[in-house]
């Protein structure tokens, strides 16, 4: 289990999101790559090899790409969790320019070029490079193991620890708070068990495959630990110690608690 991040100021919270947003984006690379292997969208269509897993992965993608927001955040409307996270960053005055620049390069020049962008913090780049190497293996059970053990089963505890430690006030960062709570609920109660089923079905009891899955499990947990530790080191260097519960004007603009349900606006 990665160490608990100590976030004591609004500046540190902003800094955390500016690093972590790349992991949120990286999650979608992993998820969509797994979908491409289990439920390919190409033409001509052929029946999927694992029909039940095709259904599972499509359900997971739908929840991540088009979740319904509650009324208090401007809903009901549909947004991807990535767009929601970006809106949460804007709400607390975090800098979205780096992730926006990387997305622009990815859209026009491809992911490999985007991964070289100097705006990516080094801890985030190392974390994404590891995911990229797993994706390039093209092995469904490798990707499913990374998704299960490095994301779905791990994230609820990570986010719960953040919420318990940071105590986000609803007027302070309601969108970020809802994002964390949503993932704790979805991943803990639904997506985590589905991910475990996916791994089990892909392995089908084969000892060699199970051994590979265990190696991936250890690797992704180790890399998540390293990512969290690197962020912790960066946060320790943040000098703004203004308490989270009392944001002040000199800390910069803190946005509205209502998310604009305009995907194109959120993408800018």
What feature does the model see in each segment?
Residues 1-261, 266:
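Non-heme di-metal
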């Amino acid at each position: 289990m990665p160490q608990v991040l100590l976030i004591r100021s609004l500046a540190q919270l902003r800094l955390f999101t500016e690093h972590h947003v790349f992991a949120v984006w990286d999650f979608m690379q992993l998820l969509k790559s797994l979908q491409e292997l289990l439920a390919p969208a190409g033409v001509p269509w052929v029946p999927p090899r694992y029909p039940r897993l095709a259904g599972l992965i499509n359900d997971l993608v739908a929840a991540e790409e088009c979740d319904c927001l509650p009324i208090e955040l401007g809903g009901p409307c549909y947004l991807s969790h990535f767009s929601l996270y970006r809106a949460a960053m804007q709400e607390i005055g975090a800098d979205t320019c780096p992730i926006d620049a990387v997305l622009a390069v990815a859209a026009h020049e491809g992911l490999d070029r985007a991964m070289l962008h100097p705006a990516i913090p080094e801890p985030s780049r190392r974390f994404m490079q590891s995911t990229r190497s797993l994706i390039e293996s093209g092995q469904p059970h490798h990707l499913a193991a990374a998704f299960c053990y490095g994301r779905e089963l791990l994230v609820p505890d990570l986010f719960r620890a953040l919420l318990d430690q940071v105590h986000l006030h609803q007027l302070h960062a309601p969108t970020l708070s809802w994002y964390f709570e949503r993932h704790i609920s979805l991943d803990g109660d639904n997506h985590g068990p589905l991910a475990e089923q996916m791994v089990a079905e892909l392995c089908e009891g084969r000892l060699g495959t199970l051994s590979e899955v265990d190696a991936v499990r250890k690797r992704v947990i180790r890399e998540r630990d390293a990512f969290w530790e690197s962020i912790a080191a960066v946060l320790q260097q943040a000098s703004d110690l203004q308490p989270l519960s009392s944001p002040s004007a000199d800390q910069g603009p803190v946005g509205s608690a209502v998310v604009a349900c305009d995907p194109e606006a959120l993408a800018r």
